[in-house]
């Protein structure tokens, strides 16, 4: 597999081999394209109380250790359709707190029917302690392509409290060539827009087994 250069990404966008919408040539790098952060976030309901507590400085300062213990006793269930709470990043910014998983999204629909897309965090964001995904940087061939344009869900977490802003350049997408007969992506997140919670529970049978 070979990674497309920046000029080749531009060429493939013009040819239709790569989908990036909206597209701004100023955001093309040597081998990547910068994607921006959508204002909409999701937080799992079990995790939301921790975000609220940190937002209320008095609660955080009063007994942070108790808060950490309380949250650790409310695990997410991979076999359950876990409810979420919606947040919006205002123009003035929103503080992301350690220990809270924020599901974000890119503003851009990005992908390809011909190449394998992959997202990674920008090094400038990483140097502030911001991670843009946990393990899901790889997109399958066909994800976000012309047949089913899609935004990317970002699994945002931080090492230290960080203020983030809507439409900030948060991550970058790259594209790699493939070998062999293609099997286009047709998974549960095809055509998604905005942040999407885990659909892993769909893999489990009625009794909780896979």
Label for each model-derived stretch:
Residues 1-210:
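DUTPase catalytic domain/fold
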């Amino acid at each position: 597999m070979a990674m497309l250069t920046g000029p080749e990404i531009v060429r493939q966008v013009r040819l239709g081999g790569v989908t990036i919408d909206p597209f701004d040539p100023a955001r093309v790098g040597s081998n990547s394209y910068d994607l921006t952060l959508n204002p909409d976030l999701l937080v799992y309901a079990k995790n939301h109380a921790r975000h609220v507590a940190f937002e209320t400085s008095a609660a955080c300062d009063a007994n942070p250790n108790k808060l950490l213990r309380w949250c650790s006793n409310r695990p997410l269930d991979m076999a359950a359709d876990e409810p979420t709470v919606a947040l919006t990043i205002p123009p003035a910014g929103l503080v992301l707190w350690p220990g809270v998983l924020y599901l974000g999204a890119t503003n851009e629909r990005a992908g390809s029917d011909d190449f394998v897309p992959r997202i990674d965090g920008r090094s400038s964001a990483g140097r502030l302690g911001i991670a843009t995904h946990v393990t899901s940087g790889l997109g399958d061939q066909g994800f976000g392509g012309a047949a089913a344009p899609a935004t990317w869900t970002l699994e945002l977490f931080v090492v230290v409290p960080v203020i983030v802003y809507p439409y900030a350049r948060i991550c970058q997408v790259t594209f790699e060539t493939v070998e062999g007969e293609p099997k286009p992506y047709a998974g549960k997140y095809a055509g998604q827009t905005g942040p999407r919670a885990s659909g892993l529970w769909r893999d489990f049978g009625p009794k909780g087994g896979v």
